[in-house]
Amino acid sequence: MIEAVSCGGVVIHRGKILLLYKNYKHKYVGWVLPKGTVEPGEMYRQTALREVYEETSVAAKVIRYIGHSQYTFQGKDDIVNKTVHWYLMRANSFYCKPQKEEYFVDAGFYKFHEAYHLLKFNDERQIMKKAYYAYMELEKKKQWIRPKSYRKNVYK
């Protein structure tokens, strides 16, 4: 069994959640959250920011760690046990552009109930739900307001 680690983000802008649509040779089709593999020497937080930017062109800011999900799948040569670390992130615009090289054909920001039903995987639904509730708590406390120093501490 191969152990693999990825990191990703639940990116929110004005209450809407960023999703990607992946279509890989008609074998894998569905809406997902942005995530990707940790590179050597990279911190999880950095990986999450980099992957969000690479897959969507969104320069996001990490707000907090949300948790992790785990799943297994059949890889090319062996079973892969993957752990994904997730972060709640904030974007400062709705602009996004899917990374075609990774077979993402669409990207967009969706209301919570739309995103919940669009997501292909239940573990991503649960992480998104947890992140959205954290966002709502911050919004209620007026702590989600974009600071003037937004451009600091974002990827890119």
PLM features per residue range, with description:
Residues 1-33:
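N-terminal strand-loop-strand
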Residues 34, 40, 148-151:
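Functional cleft and adjacent loop/helix regions within the main domain
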Residues 38-126, 155:
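Unchanged
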Residues 117, 122-156:
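Charged phosphate-binding loop/patch that engages nucleotide di/tri-phosphates or the phosphate backbone
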